[in-house]
Amino acid sequence: MPKVKALQCALALEIRSVTCPGVLLKDKEDIYLSICVFGQYKKTQCVPATFPLVFNARMVFEKVFPEAVDPGDVVAQLEYDTAVFELIQLVPPVGETLSTYDENTRDFMFPGPNQISGHHDSNRQVTMRRISGLRGIAPKLEFSTTSVITECLISSRKCRTQDKFTYHSAPVEKPHGRLQCRTSRSQKKKSKSPERSKYCINTKNYEQPTISSKSHSPSPYTKRRMCELSEDTRRRLAHLNLGPYEFKKETDKPPFVIRHVDPPSPRADNFFGSPGRDCERDGWVRMHSDHPHLGCCRAKDYKVIRSPHGRDFEDPFERCEDYLSPRTCSKPQHSARTLLVHSAPSTTPKHCASPVLNRASLRERFHSDWCSPPNCDEIHDRVKDVLKSHQAHGRHLCEERDPEKEDELELKRSLLYRDSAYDSDPEYSSFQRPRGSFHLDDGECWSNRAASCKGKSHRPVFENSMDKMYRNLYQKACSSVSHTQESF
């Protein structure tokens, strides 16, 4: 491969300590310092959480600029890069950033005269910015840098892959504190060896796991939270394969899965499922024909859901709409609701695809309980018991009453019942009414012929008779009270 000339910028960074006098950390986990220069992430060893934090770490950052012609072009390109320092404590689950410091890479590598004192590689002190979990004064970072721009020979392939890969070098320990420059001869040997060239281009350093992520197993909630972190933190935690998370509402999910939907059919088998339900279907038809209060209920087209086992199931939501839909009359609606409350669930197969399909349909529960002969007999027996209890209670009250007053009340009750029945039915003509005469309280006889001749209906005659009767009762009661007082 042909060799081309390029400029290589190397930065030797020596981190000494982080000081913050008078500050105590509430958490006791270890702390490390993360550095990002030239897009390369490196970190120091962990130290105890007690200020001052003494690191004494040395690391080297290198980057090749194949398009640069002179060092001025390299310095100009360094203006678009940022050097970032992060002081991170290993607080579960993903660590907590205590303070940060960022500066333009050009100013960081080549500081001005006001930032250094004495030699170029002397110590520097910068104030970091507090973020969270740190109270008091801001911490101060002590470090020193050595920057070198050299000319090197690289292959054209490396020039094309410079933007895709990053060249890393392990921290080199030098006894005299000087940066060891690689010669072109050593680079030529490395380029010839395929094994060494494979290790020259390593994976990106930010793809390597952090110390905190190695020591803790993230939970599902932590994974979702880590997806919302900054871009730099997401790069450091890329080995976890968190992936993009899209939070959806629960309403977007369907209530149940419909396996197969058949077109509606007018046949009765589609309404009631398999032919094994013929008895239940006949009972349902009898209910519609025998009970007039359910006349407004009509059968509708239902969607049939086919299970993997071949059995048809009715859509439960269609059945609910059929029973709970508003009706023209109020009585059927009340009866339907009453039947829904007192219905008992029937047995269904347990191999349905959805738990909703395991429930018995409202129609099955409706007519399976009310059309069976034992239930009908039980209902009739209960009604008879209630009627007998009311008759016994009425008979007991009649025994306590006066026989004469009871005869009068019975006569008036019969007149009231017949007259109300005639008046409530406008189609009931006078020719259809039974012929007969009625005796009033004063011995007068009132018949249908007398009503037609005098032009008075039974209602006003009944009201007049009731007035007379209550007036006589009142007079008798007053006379009995006065007679009792005189006797005393």
Curated annotation (Swiss-Prot):
Tissue specificity note: Testis-specific, in spermatocytes.
Chain residue numbers at which the record places covalent cross-link Glycyl lysine isopeptide (Lys-Gly) (interchain with G-Cter in SUMO2): 248
GO cellular component, one term: motile cilium
Span list, region Disordered: 175-225
Assigned keywords, A-Z: Cell projection, Cilium, Developmental protein, Differentiation, Flagellum, Isopeptide bond, Phosphoprotein, Secreted, Signal, Spermatogenesis, Ubl conjugation
Presence of keyword Secreted: yes
Ranges annotated as biased composition (Polar residues): 200-220
Modified residue annotations for Phosphoserine: 217, 219, 265, 274, 325, 343, 346, 354, 424, 465, 487
Coarse class of the protein's main subcellular location: secreted
GO molecular function: myosin light chain binding
Family of the protein in this entry: Belongs to the SPATA6 family.
Subunit structure: Interacts with MYL6.
Record-given protein name: Spermatogenesis-associated protein 6
Organism: Rattus norvegicus
Gene: Spata6
